[in-house]
Amino acid sequence: MLPIGLDTDVNASAIGEATYGVTKGLDSSIYITVGTGIGVGVILDGKAVHGMQHPEAGHILLSRHPEDTYAGRCPYHGNAWRDSHRDRLIERAFLEERQGTSCGFRAMGIESYYLAQALVDFTLTYSPKRIVLGGGVMHQKQLFAMIREKYKKMLNHYVDTPYVRDLDNYIVPYSLNDDQGIMGCIRIGLDEMKR
């Protein structure tokens, strides 16, 4: 019988980055996918976190951006991070920016506010040595500078380690030609075959 390994898509991405990518060699890291939704994979002591279930970090509650009036769609948490991210304003604004209008910059400001806030929370709770941002939205590379700037302001030097002092190497884009999920699945399969 052929062994089968199972995990979530975002954990596979976190494992892929930790095995072959930008977090290889680090014992702790976080991979966040920002696309049609929000997913978070956490690596601690070199392994994906599994407690009573996988992390559902897309449902963490964040302080609402002052310009965000969207009530959210989540039936459980009106201001869940995933709903703040999925606001139609943001979706529309990214489209408008690609078409050459200036509305997208405002939407990126809102998006980077929520991302920075979540990253501060994850820094304080998981103490990762690197945070990787992937998914379709993160193909907008200009978001990284905005996220880092807001993150630094929100963290306000509360954590002062060499990792967070070098934000360009702490909050980083995905690697592996955006194939980190497939690469993670390979690692999961290889590990399962060894059991």
Per-region residue spans from a language model:
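Short secondary-structure boundary segments
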Residues: 34-36, 135-136
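A short acidic/small-residue loop/turn micro-motif
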Residues: 55-58
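A cytosolic small-molecule/anion-sensing beta-strand core signal
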Residues: 44-45
